[in-house]
């Protein structure tokens, strides 16, 4: 309790799964976090010792067909996602949440540089987590 300032307002994007490594680290057990853990240790962010942007992966998978569904990323400013049907990318969406907080206007077609950047980040994450969806991302063109 003495490490974390009370009544701290923060816009840190943290997923439920990130609690496991983050809490272990906060309790002094960083070295005991298994290498197989695929979520993030955000303890440095919680303690205010890191200003690095957190990028959270997003998944929507049909459990009977892993080649169909969404994968994406969310940053502090953007939401990016791609959809595949049977292993073929058929939709790419990109929203600027600072200008379009309700995510009504897909700007993927107007922002090819950002699409490539987020596509690269997403593919790296999917390869890291052994998600076969990573192999479909080579077909992203928008």
Where are these regions (language model features)?
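Short, solvent-exposed loop/turn segments at secondary-structure boundaries
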Residues: 8-11, 107-109
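Intrinsically disordered, low-complexity polar regions and short flexible loop motifs
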Residues: 100
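Long, internal low-complexity/basic segments
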Residues: 19, 69, 107-142
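C-terminal cap/loop subdomain of S1 sulfatases and analogous C-terminal strand-loop tails that border
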Residues: 2-6, 12, 17-20, 24-93, ...
